[in-house]
Swiss-Prot record:
It holds the Pfam family Ribosomal_S14. SUPFAM superfamilies: Glucocorticoid receptor-like (DNA-binding domain). Binds 1 zinc ion per subunit. Disulfide bonds: none annotated. Belongs to the universal ribosomal protein uS14 family. One of its GO terms (cellular component) is cytosolic small ribosomal subunit. The lineage of its organism: Eukaryota, Rhodophyta, Florideophyceae, Rhodymeniophycidae, Ceramiales. This is Small ribosomal subunit protein uS14. It comes from Griffithsia japonica (Red alga).
């Protein structure tokens, strides 16, 4: 059994490892509110298209 076979063999059904950004697939900095599941970088890029308005 090589290193690659062992490295990601554990099932990811819950926790941080199971979730990723819908747009880019990134696992860090996820915004999960309202079940968006978008990373913060993609959120800044697509916020206006989604319907969020920046007041300041």
């Amino acid at each position: 059994m090589g290193h690659q076979n062992i490295w990601y063999s554990h099932p990811r059904k819950y926790g941080k490892g199971s979730r990723s950004c819908k747009i880019c697939g990134n696992k860090h900095g996820l915004i999960r509110k309202y079940s968006m599941n978008i990373c913060r970088q993609c959120f800044r890029e697509y916020a206006k298209d989604i319907g969020f308005i920046k007041y300041r």
